[in-house]
């Protein structure tokens, strides 16, 4: 484990030449990537905690710009050759998109899974920090010790398997009002960053086939902006839904790892992608 002036991170399998940087979803931390990283032992894996998350709580306030800056600094300092393949999911994918606009020189390639770039229905409320603060006060402090509420959110909102309940519960119990507000505002108001069309970074863009229309349209819009990319939708089969496709790094880690490995080596992608 290491702590730079910026982000807390873990550096695994450092003997391998190619560096992957993993950027997690909002409200979680680097632990979310464990099932995938355990299957990619042939790569040097950097697993970061984003600003105002996990071990990087002191790096704040969270914003896409700040997160992109700190992730780029981490790559320059820790990645082999000062460049990495950046893999982002959900809010981490939004950070990767911001990096494509601001710091493409540190990115060999990018895997962008479910980056929201367009307004969701009712998104206007997220411009009001006061409303989000009220939402926090109603939905978090009264339930900090409520296992059923935490499990409900973990499974149906976040798509996180039961094995990671201790980590999810700890994050829920430690969440602050400012963290919640900053994350929600950043996530829901993020739009296509200026200058991204100039990024000459090969990208794999994915989203779930059961995700919201705004998410699918965001992926298509990003694909239309980038010079060199492939766009796929995820379908995890019968019983699949929004949450488990959105967080497929945890619900289908073998498929996620195989997607990374096969895309980087030019092999056919797993059948869950079409």
Model-identified regions with their sequence ranges:
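Gly/Ala-rich beta-loop-alpha elbow adjacent to hydrolase catalytic centers
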Residues: 88-92, 96
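Conserved alpha/beta-hydrolase "acid-adjacent" motif
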Residues: 212-218
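Conserved alpha/beta-hydrolase catalytic His-Asp/Glu region
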Residues: 121-123, 141-197
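Catalytic active-site module of serine/aspartate enzymes centered on a nucleophile-bearing elbow/loop
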Residues: 229-274
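Flexible "cap/lid" loop of the alpha/beta hydrolase fold
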Residues: 101, 109-139
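Active-site loop/oxyanion-hole signature of alpha/beta-hydrolase fold enzymes
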Residues: 46-87, 244-250
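Short beta-strand/loop motif that positions the catalytic acidic residue
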Residues: 199, 205-207
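Conserved HGGG/HGGXW glycine-rich cap/lid loop of the alpha/beta-hydrolase fold
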Residues: 7-57
């Amino acid at each position: 484990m290491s702590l730079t002036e910026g982000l807390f991170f873990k550096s695994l399998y450092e003997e391998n030449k190619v560096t992957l940087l993993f950027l997690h979803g909002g409200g979680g931390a680097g632990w979310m990537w464990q099932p995938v990283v355990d299957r990619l032992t042939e790569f040097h894996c950097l697993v970061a905690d984003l600003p105002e998350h996990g071990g990087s709580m002191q790096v704040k306030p969270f914003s896409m710009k700040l997160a992109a800056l700190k992730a780029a600094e981490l790559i320059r300092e820790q990645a082999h050759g000062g460049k990495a393949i950046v893999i982002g999911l959900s809010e981490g994918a939004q950070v990767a998109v911001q990096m494509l606009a601001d710091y493409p020189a540190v990115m060999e390639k990018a895997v962008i899974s479910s980056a929201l770039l367009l307004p969701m229905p009712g998104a206007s409320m997220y411009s009001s920090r006061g409303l989000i603060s009220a939402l926090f006060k109603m939905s978090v402090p009264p339930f900090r010790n409520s296992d059923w509420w935490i499990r409900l959110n973990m499974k149906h909102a976040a798509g996180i398997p039961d094995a990671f309940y201790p980590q999810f519960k700890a994050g829920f119990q430690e969440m602050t009002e400012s963290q919640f507000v900053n994350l929600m505002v950043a996530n829901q108001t993020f739009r296509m960053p200026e200058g991204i069309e100039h990024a000459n970074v090969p990208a794999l863009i994915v989203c779930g086939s059961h995700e919201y229309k705004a998410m699918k349209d965001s992926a298509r819009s990003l694909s239309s902006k980038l010079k060199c990319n492939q766009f796929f939708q995820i379908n995890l089969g019968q019983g699949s839904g929004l949450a488990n496709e959105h967080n497929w790094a945890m619900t289908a880690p073998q498929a996620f790892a195989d997607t990374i490995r096969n895309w980087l080596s030019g092999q056919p992608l797993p059948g869950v992608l079409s």
